[in-house]
Amino acid sequence: MGKTGPQPGRRLGSGRGWRAGAAFALGVLIAAALVGLTVRFQLDGPARWFWILVVVATALAVLALRATGRRSASRAVLLASIIGALGWWLTIRPLGDRDWAADVAYGVTARIEGQTAILDHVRNFDWRSKQDFTSQWETRRYDISTLSSVDLATSTWDNPAIAHTLVSFGFSDGAYLTFSAEIRRERHESFSEIGGFFKKFELVLIAADEADILRLRTNIRREDVALYRLNLTPAQRRALFMTYLEKANQLAAQPAFYHTITANCTTIIFQMARLVAPGIPMDWRILLSGYLPDYLHDHGVTDAGLPLEELRANARISAKAQQADPAIPYSIAIRAEDPSKR
């Protein structure tokens, strides 16, 4: 009798089983990592470590049940754990009454009386260093009919592909008001990009004087800041300004979480811009905000008559701000060499 030949079907089935087991294990590890990171950013002290141990023990139990052939039990434990984790995730709500860091203690709110916008909690800090400053929150009045310009500011530090973005509105009397969507840190917190995926921070809309919020970045933090004049019609300028005020009041009434991808300084600008101009397309440069000026240049929102590199070079203001005569108002100093921004 001849020898029994190889049984490829059995080997193939065995291979499929191995791959299915590996995929299951990978899924368990990813789920455990996501839940563990949520615990890491939501809990403090002994509770954090207790629940991290629970997550690890549950993942090991699921894998052990699978490895010993008790697949139904493994799936049941995994499903129950996922349902429990999702249920907890849905209970994590944004709050508006935490012990906030001084620079985000208040979000701006607004009310309209005729052509006048009255803004409460406009920030006007005097920064001497990152930790040494004089706090000042003001109520200001702006004549909406005198809106004369809109500038986009970008601020980069370590990675040129990632920028913080701000929008500054100019008025015919020489006043400027800058809006910035920021994480709302508590006093003991520091920023974490990863934490922004796990409901770690609330979102706040800050309205501030340029001599506060831009000078902090140019002169105190020494970041690379650029200022781009946007080509908007008077109607678009007004609509964008009003959209910011509406967003500010909305956040005051209904707090929201900051999200590293979907609700950050740049995506908030994009969402509001789409309310003004619904046809503007989504683009990868909205997420990699350091390239936002390229996107705006391509769509004619900035000065399309200049090559992009020249536009970028002309827009940089940090050196001008640092070298300016302190007697010259900050907003004039950073625009001094660019008549189009006066």
Please annotate each region the language model reported.
Residues 117, 128-225:
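Glycine-rich catalytic cores of cysteine/serine-nucleophile enzymes that process amide/ester linkages
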Residues 71-94:
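Internal/C-terminal transmembrane anchor helices
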Residues 52-78:
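Cytosolic-side transmembrane helix boundary signature
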Residues 118-124:
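Acidic, Ser/Thr-rich low-complexity segments on the non-lumenal side of membrane proteins
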Residues 13-62, 246-342:
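Activation targets extended, charge/polar-rich intrinsically disordered C-terminal tails
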Residues 94-113:
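Alpha-helical transmembrane signal-anchor/signal-peptide segments
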Residues 1-14:
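Short, Lys/Arg-rich, polar N-terminal cytosolic tail immediately upstream
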Residues 198-275:
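Soluble catalytic domains of enzymes that build or remodel membrane lipids, polysaccharides, and related
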